[in-house]
Amino acid sequence: MAFGQRNTSRGGRGGGGSSFRGRGGSRGGPRGRGGLRGGRGRGRGRPVFDSARLAQQKEEGEESNSESEESSQDEAMESEEESSDDDDAEPAPAVKSYAALMQSFTADSAPQAKRRKLNVDKEEKQDEEADLMDQDANDADHVEEAEEGPETATDGLLEEEDEEDNSDPFEAHFANPDDNILSRRLKHLENGQWAIQKSILAKIGRAITSVPGDDEAKQTKSSIINSPEELKLKQKLAGVMKKQCPTFDTLEKSISPLIFGYQDLLFCERNTSNAESLRRLTCLHAVNHVFKTRDRVIKNNSRLAREDNSDDLELRDQGFTRPKVLMLLPTRESCVRMVDMITSLCEPDQQENRKRFNDSYVDKEEKYSTDKPEDFRELFAGNDDDMFRLGLKFTRKTVKYFSQFYNSDIIFASPLGLRMAIGNEDAKKVDHDFLSSIEMVIVDQADALLMQNWEHVEFIFDHLNLQPKEAHGCDFSRVRSWYLDNNAKYFRQTIALAGFNTPELNTMFYNQSKNWAGKVKVSSNYPGAIQELGLKVKQTFSRLDSQSFASDPDSRFEYFTSAIIPTLTRRSKDSAGTLLFIPSYLDFVRVRNYFSTSATTRTLSFGSISEYTTPKEVARARSHFYSGRHTILLYTERAHHFRRYQIRGVKKVIMYGLPDNPIFYKEIVGGYLSRSVREGDLEPGDGSVRVVFSKWDVMKLERIAGTERVGKMIKEKGDTFDFL
């Protein structure tokens, strides 16, 4: 049974029930891990990774001991002119009426015809229950708690009487939206009509605002908010913010109107410097939203209790289920940071189950020294397990950890952990009703989630705001009409924070952001990583001709074998110290097999390091490469992401494709070659870099070559570009 599913005998579970090993990247490389526990769990054994390209691995002779996994899916990508800017027509949503919803509950509850059950069925059921109990025993996030009604256990959260303010974005967006504006924008959403405006945010970057309509985006201007005092906060939160953060910095002034105005936001400039500010803003907004939602329910409960003719009152103030905020995070440590920020803002008198939370999530051991990059230490410090889910429940004076999902206000989870909680679609028991009333999704460090399994993120978004299969004690007379009309997805706010934009993030923002308040994408103008290497080296960028995104892997391989390999084989002795960087694991397998079996490369000795290579094999490959026994070393992007190896003996770098993260380009080209110069293995100015790219790499190329250069490099007739 999935975590949070109704169960009168055992309460909610956390995690179990699903047996899939979900992995795979939509861009041709595995993006994460699967398995029942699946987590990288540094310090708990060697890293475990899975592959996403089963079919191609079999064709290319992948090792017999590799685990079987799901095939990656081809991803439709926008052209270079529109990949980072515009939104096109979107499909019209289906509307399910209130009557149809109630009919579905009636149908589900109707008596079913009796069937004879064979003994084998009973044995299978007993085996399944035994498996679930075993999973629960090993599950640190397992919860046994009876499910409460969605809005009945209010627990006296209301502390102060805040008057309803029509200028409050909470009122304007959720509680009392303008019917004329709302109906008009919903119609535009059904027709896929967006008005788009481009602007500049001072000292931040470019902003692309999209609002449902024809020309409304041009009329909408986000004002600057200078301090928390200008926000519509609950009194307690306002008092805390006045002490902790009396004024906003430049970033907070610019994006707080977007966040607190309930617009969707794709912010592509997250880094270690602004991470704390972004965390504070998003947590403040989430807690403020939860408090206002719960207080409205409590106030209306009191009103109904006082009124003699309460049946005549129509107070629609809630959703189908209680959870209102979902936070998707990469590791348990990132969850700890979010939780600590929330508790510092709401200052609860008591924290129930905090010790259990500390035992399961907090790891204070210093695992990495300062020789590791700052972004690496931020992501992998502490407990870096990526298999978790946690419910958080607020009462007037208490925060409760490990609350059952249906009793929670905020759900924290990794994509893998939440998908395991929902269950596999092929399994008998699948539960995603607890996601039916999510009104805010916060995806932090989205670029790190790309290095896990992005398909899990897509799966979760596909199951948000669906009408529930069970009533879960819901009082439908209190449910907001736009929930009953299946329009909840148009009210949900999505906030995605990433270090850079990618086709996956763009696609998610295009397909899943249907907010009637509009959406904003913020990115920067890039000077180019080629200018930030710290040494002088010739960098040659070669553009290959690729007719389609789907055929790009084949075109790239053909270009590599016909244009790059001959330069290596003609002077095999001069090829010593060549690092071949390959972003995609699928391409890595294909190239490795080519080196192993092709007669063309018989004069080239090589080693390889991927995300699946054991530590012992990594040490051997690095040693042979540095000693010269192997002239070429194949190296994947995800291996670098998870380990950041300091590879010695690099004299030349060939990039089969560009990395998503521009920091990787600086570390591999600038860092590795600079080290070789310092250690006397390479004369200054003798190193070289060869980069292969296609028009489908426009986002990566912009970050590495620079915003001003990318257009010419994609469109010019010449296909070779040299930089020093």
UniProtKB/Swiss-Prot annotation:
It is found in: Nucleus, Nucleolus. One of its GO terms (cellular component) is nucleolus. The keyword rRNA processing applies. Residues 11-38 have a biased composition (Gly residues). The keyword rRNA-binding does not apply. Residues 60-90, 126-150, 157-168 have a biased composition (Acidic residues). One of its GO terms (molecular function) is rRNA binding. Pfam families: Utp25_C, UTP25_NTPase-like. Residues 1-176 are annotated as: Disordered. Keywords: Nucleus, Ribonucleoprotein, Ribosome biogenesis, rRNA processing. GO terms for biological process: maturation of SSU-rRNA from tricistronic rRNA transcript (SSU-rRNA, 5.8S rRNA, LSU-rRNA). Its main location: nucleus. Component of the ribosomal small subunit (SSU) processome composed of at least 40 protein subunits and snoRNA U3. Belongs to the UTP25 family. DEAD-box RNA helicase-like protein required for pre-18S rRNA processing, specifically at sites A0, A1, and A2. This is U3 small nucleolar RNA-associated protein 25. The lineage of its organism: Eukaryota, Fungi, Dikarya, Ascomycota, Pezizomycotina.
